[in-house]
Amino acid sequence: MNKYVALLRGINISGKNRIDMSELKSELEASGFREVSTYLNSGNIVFVSEMANCKPVIENIILQKFKLDIPVYLIEMEELKDILAHSPIWWDSGSKDKYDNLIFILSSDSAEDISAIIGNPSDNLERVEIYKSVIFWTFERSTYQKCHWWKKTSENGIAERLTIRTANTVKKISQR
């Protein structure tokens, strides 16, 4: 049995793509997932399963129960912990002036592909580093609107390929 993390993209934002996390938890348990827990209302799920490929099962549950076609990023908990263990020294500094994110790629694109599509980060305003299939991204809160990556990650054609979590959220998920 493996422990997994499922990250749902774009749910419960401004009343759109509404999914009750307790209902989703119950549906997952009824489908054979074990030790299911959710964190926040933004689509962070931790569970144990014997299934090798849980992603289509989760997507189908969401489609059938909530009538929503929501992309799911699935990662083994051990892989997530490895990613966090290899975070750049500048990421998750604890500074309230910085916003530290981890970008997960939903599409078949590699992290390098996404980075190339978005382009270089804004000098002195943001930092980006790729590790395996994710991108660490940090920017100053006071200048976020000037950041190249801030603008590009929300554009059509790119936003759909990503799901983004803050450093704090990812750390909390990894402790479950």
Go through each PLM region and give its residues:
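Surface-exposed, charge/polar-rich loops and edge strands
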Residues: 2-42, 46-176
